[in-house]
């Protein structure tokens, strides 16, 4: 049995080698599927609010699930509203109404004001 003191040192935490594409038997490279998430955006917002605070991968997974869930709820409600009004397009008005219906009180007010600010910034940058 090899002596644990003489074995190769364990790699430092955070130092991961670049993952290369998997090789098939016929020599062709297989493309790895991309996993989309909101993690970079959650991280950017976290750093704006609390610059000295980090987030674990488990917490990031929970935040990603939360954002996906809220997105689906708002999109579904906005779709329903457009259908009720015999419209085929979801506009910012449907999104705003969906947010007002889904989110409680003060949270809805803040979400609507932030959304309006984002739409104004986007239209002025065009």
Curated annotation (Swiss-Prot):
InterPro entries recorded: Histone-fold (IPR009072), Histone_H2A/H2B/H3 (IPR007125), Histone_H2B (IPR000558), HISTONE_H2B_site (IPR055333)
Gene Ontology annotations for the cellular component aspect, listed alphabetically: cytosol; nucleoplasm; nucleosome; nucleus
N6-crotonyllysine modification, residue list: 6, 12-13, 16-17, 21, 24, 35
Location within or outside the cell: Nucleus; Chromosome
Signal peptide residues on this chain, from the entry's feature table: none
Phosphoserine: residues bearing it: 15, 37
Residues modified as N6-succinyllysine: 35, 117, 121
Disulfide feature: none
GO BP term, example: nucleosome assembly
Residues with N6-methylated lysine modification: 117
Any one Pfam family match given in the protein's UniProt record, by short name: Histone
Dimethylated arginine PTM sites in chain numbering: 80
Residues bearing the modification N6-methyllysine: 47, 109
Cross-link (Glycyl lysine isopeptide (Lys-Gly) (interchain with G-Cter in ubiquitin)): 35, 121
Chain positions carrying an annotated carbohydrate: 113
N6-(beta-hydroxybutyryl)lysine modified-residue sites: 6, 12, 17, 21, 35, 86, 117, 121
Cross-link (Glycyl lysine isopeptide (Lys-Gly) (interchain with G-Cter in SUMO2)): 6, 21
Note: The mouse orthologous protein seems not to exist.
Protein name: Histone H2B type 1-O
Gene symbol of the encoding locus: H2BC17
